[in-house]
């Protein structure tokens, strides 16, 4: 994702990855500084970030951050299952064999840091019967679906229904 999260007029970069994500502040002149830890948007070592979007979810003029996470995966889990292809050897398992992972919504605090408001915003969708995360998010599209001036989010999932998060006009 790209966006000016700190309002300095320079486009910053957020990269998603397996095992943690990375926020790079644009210093100008083609130089970037990693500020992930200081900003509080790295996620955990077991996260599998797949995409992200900078979006002003609370209409306060600064860019908040929505991050898609795919499944709860690790090398240890994958090796434990021991997937193999005949004649080839090592393989990776189907996504249906892994528990989903919650996406994250971070509110920009306006001082270079973000607060995780995922729970309050209702983006941590759980299976009502098991309590496990339902999402296996691959992509997010910010759009004002109802033309009320507040950005809503459409999230594309793998092997489970997609999500539409309607902005409640209160930061959630």
Predicted regions and their residues:
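Acidic, glycine/proline-rich Ca2+-coordinating loop motifs
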Residues: 1-172
């Amino acid at each position: 994702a790209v966006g000016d999260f700190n309002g300095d007029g320079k486009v910053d970069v957020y990269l998603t990855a397996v095992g943690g994500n990375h926020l790079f502040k644009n210093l100008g002149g083609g130089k970037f500084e990693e500020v992930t830890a200081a900003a509080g948007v790295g996620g955990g070592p077991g996260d599998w970030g797949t995409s992200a979007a900078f979006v002003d979810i609370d209409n306060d003029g600064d860019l908040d951050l929505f991050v898609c996470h795919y499944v709860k995966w690790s090398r240890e889990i994958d090796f434990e299952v021991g997937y193999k292809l005949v004649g080839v050897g090592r393989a990776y398992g189907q996504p249906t064999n892994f528990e989903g992972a919650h996406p994250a919504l971070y509110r920009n605090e306006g001082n270079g840091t973000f607060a995780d408001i995922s729970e309050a915003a209702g983006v941590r969708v759980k299976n009502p019967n098991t309590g496990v995360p339902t999402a296996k998010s691959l992509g997010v599209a910010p759009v004002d679906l109802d033309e009320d001036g507040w950005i809503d989010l459409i999230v594309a999932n793998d092997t489970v229904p997609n999500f539409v998060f309607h902005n409640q006009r209160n930061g959630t």
